[in-house]
Amino acid sequence: MKKYQLGEFEEVVILTIAILYKEAYGVAIKKEIETRLARNVSMGAMHTALVRLEDKGYIKSLPGEETEERMGRPRRYYQITALGKKAMEYSKETRNALWSAIPKVSLNLKIVG
């Protein structure tokens, strides 16, 4: 059963929203991911992930103030919901359980062959 489902990029996005806290809007999230992970992110991929996370109820968006630089349109700020926090915790617990289950010998790269 898929209790909470976060794709890899969705997990990166929701973690970044948590990092940015009250400054989590599209371009800021994109830049933070690119800086922290040295990874290029398209605005299309970012938008898709934000829509999916909001559709799942893991985040919510709120309009900010209108700005001239955005031609009067407000930024959309993102916040993690209680359900989103649970999804993040579930994802972390799942990954930690998998890492803990790996036998040390499994990661011994001195394989003779």
Give residue spans per PLM region.
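Basic, short loop/linker segments at the boundary and entry of helix-turn-helix/winged-helix-like folds
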Residues: 1-6, 78
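N-terminal helix-turn-helix DNA-binding core of bacterial DNA-binding proteins
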Residues: 4-45
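Short aromatic/hydrophobic contact patches that present stacked aromatics
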Residues: 14, 77-79
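Alpha-helical residues within the helix-turn-helix
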Residues: 31, 54-55
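Basic amphipathic alpha-helical segments that dock to polyanions
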Residues: 46-48, 52-53
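Beta-hairpin "wing" of winged helix-turn-helix
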Residues: 56-71
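Exposed loop/turn and edge beta-strand positions of beta-sandwich/beta-sheet ligand-binding modules
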Residues: 74
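Amphipathic alpha-helical dimerization/coiled-coil segments
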Residues: 83-113
